[in-house]
């Protein structure tokens, strides 16, 4: 085989390998301390990235639509549409809600529609009752679609929470944005597309910006279950089996440890006896935990920060709980003394 032919074959093999790697990537939360690029043009006019809007595929329930009826690309023609992929236990997604709600309140009368596509990260987020509660708790009034089997997610080839896809009144994709921030740019893009669709005057610009100070966040998002568990100091138990653990007195930086009787499951770890202990060394200004109750009853957790009592948390519904706050950031050891069996720990996020 000639040298050029061998080189071509090698390049083809590399491309195939890269394609396989990317096809195996699962859904991802956008890293809290990085901001993916927003698609823009130097002329200020948004490019056409795709000529049509994908269908809302495999949606099992709609909220905030007339009669709970589904929306379609055809029914949205003539509107500027922002499709926002989110999930209710994701802190990054929750931090975007004040912006999205203010954007919708200001520009819906001018022709903006926001569609929140709720694609679950955890099993409990596929439950319509849990999603309904989250919509009400967060005061969301724009349409929301439940995408439990990732039909719409896959139709968009999406990979991230949160992820925004902005369509013009003709149904063409004009901009994408992944992660938090750049809210003023998104608002300007919405105004630009509304201006293309109509000459009617728009309200003055200005929306809520809740972008956090990422420089205070050192500890990465951490998962606890067998599927994606990381940073654990201790013996990992087999699925569906109780394991006795001894907690390290002081965890390593950005690591967690546990003491007492615990059970490891694919998406979470669960306390199995009263008096179990959880410790985590974190550097951030807030620690949030995605927690649930195995039987749905209230579970009580006492919180200690650097050895000092810092309140308590009552866990019932599976959702994000703010467990500890550290003004000014810095490194701290958070200890949770758990009164009840059946507290499920899914993940930790920071702000």
Regions found by a protein language model. Name each.
Residues 136-141, 146-189, 325-327:
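Thiol/disulfide oxidoreductase modules built on the thioredoxin-like
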Residues 69-94, 100, 113-115:
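Short active-site neighborhood of thiol/selenol oxidoreductases, capturing the structured segment around
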Residues 94-137, 146-153:
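Structural microenvironment flanking redox-active thiols in thiol-disulfide oxidoreductases
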Residues 55-81, 104-107:
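A short beta-strand-turn-helix
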Residues 2-39, 43-62, 184-351:
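Non-globular targeting/processing and membrane-anchoring segments
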Residues 76-79, 109, 140-141, 158:
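Active-site acidic short loop of glycosyltransferases
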